[in-house]
Amino acid sequence: MFSGSIPALVTPFRDGAFDEKAFRRLVDWQIENGSSALVPCGTTGEASTLSNAEHHRVIEVCVEQAAGRVPVIAGCGSNDTMNALLHMNFSKKCGAQAALCVAPYYNRPSQAGIIAHFSYLAEHNDLPIVLYNVPGRTVTDILPETVCELAKRYPDKIIGIKDASGDLSRVTDHRMGIGKHFCQLSGDDELALPANAAGAVGCISVTANVAPRLCADFQAACAANDLEKARELNDKLYPLHYAMFEDASPGPVKYALSRVFADINEDLRLPMVPCNEAARKAVDAALVHAGLLELA
């Protein structure tokens, strides 16, 4: 089971190309600062702007650089089931420990279609699957009854969920419908504390890109049932959680990384553009609040 602070890693670019050297340094920095697993090629990693060859190279580099120190949950989502399987096949071959598979987006399948999609993936690859529910982006909601059906149908294949629905009742729905063994990970940093209280065991995090040690310590406090410490760390991180979405993501998180980690610049791929001035001010203020930046 995966648990703790799991960054949804940014994909660094330089002059329009994947900056492999910066990414390797980011992987090392994350592991050195307590991240318990890594997710390349998720939403924050701008996976939708990567060619398949680039997508696979990012996963491959992440697995190589992690070198078994922490597990890699490879972003394998697609609204084309065969393309999702292609990503899973590559990820399995290169040594990833699991696949993060988002609900098919844009084509808006029914719940029956969602079940068919994930069933096909589970039946045609041995890589464990973490479902990813983010209806605000996909316009498709993996309903609790669908999650429960999939988890019961494929108990060794569909092992968990990253839920970014914003609905905290889902954690209890899944826990009661499937059991404690089902790995529930928050997909919303600002809801990680109440999600953990309800039965989640960690967070696939945007903020952890920038504040890996604080996020890891926060998750450790939750796991130890040290509510006072968890609240203290959550309060430190709270403004940063919201600053990461002050403008279209991942613009703010790349700006924040450029402030605290010299190897990462703000380069994004169109249609994403660098964050606006208001977002920069919010990020700077949040970094100061978290003790990660001193302004002159």
UniProtKB/Swiss-Prot annotation:
Protein name per its UniProtKB record: 4-hydroxy-tetrahydrodipicolinate synthase
Catalytic activity: L-aspartate 4-semialdehyde + pyruvate = (2S,4S)-4-hydroxy-2,3,4,5-tetrahydrodipicolinate + H2O + H(+)
InterPro entries tied to this protein: Aldolase_TIM (IPR013785), DapA (IPR005263), DapA-like (IPR002220), Schiff_base-form_aldolases_CS (IPR020624)
Active site: Y132, K162
UniProt keyword annotations, A-Z: Amino-acid biosynthesis, Cytoplasm, Diaminopimelate biosynthesis, Lyase, Lysine biosynthesis, Schiff base
GO terms for biological process, alphabetical: diaminopimelate biosynthetic process; lysine biosynthetic process via diaminopimelate
Similarity comment text for this entry: Belongs to the DapA family.
Pfam families xrefs: DHDPS
Subunit composition and interactions: Homotetramer; dimer of dimers.
Pathway given in the UniProt record: Amino-acid biosynthesis; L-lysine biosynthesis via DAP pathway; (S)-tetrahydrodipicolinate from L-aspartate: step 3/4
Sites marked Part of a proton relay during catalysis: T43, Y106
Disulfide bonds: none
Classification via CDD domains: DHDPS
Organism: Novosphingobium aromaticivorans (strain ATCC 700278 / DSM 12444 / CCUG 56034 / CIP 105152 / NBRC 16084 / F199)
Superkingdom of the organism of origin: Bacteria
GO cellular component: cytosol
Primary residence: cytoplasm
Keyword Amino-acid biosynthesis (UniProt): yes
Gene Ontology MF term list: 4-hydroxy-tetrahydrodipicolinate synthase activity
EC number of this enzyme: 4.3.3.7
Described function: Catalyzes the condensation of (S)-aspartate-beta-semialdehyde [(S)-ASA] and pyruvate to 4-hydroxy-tetrahydrodipicolinate (HTPA).
Location relative to the cell: Cytoplasm
Binding site for pyruvate: T44, I204
Lineage: Bacteria, Pseudomonadati, Pseudomonadota, Alphaproteobacteria, Sphingomonadales
Keyword presence, Signal: no
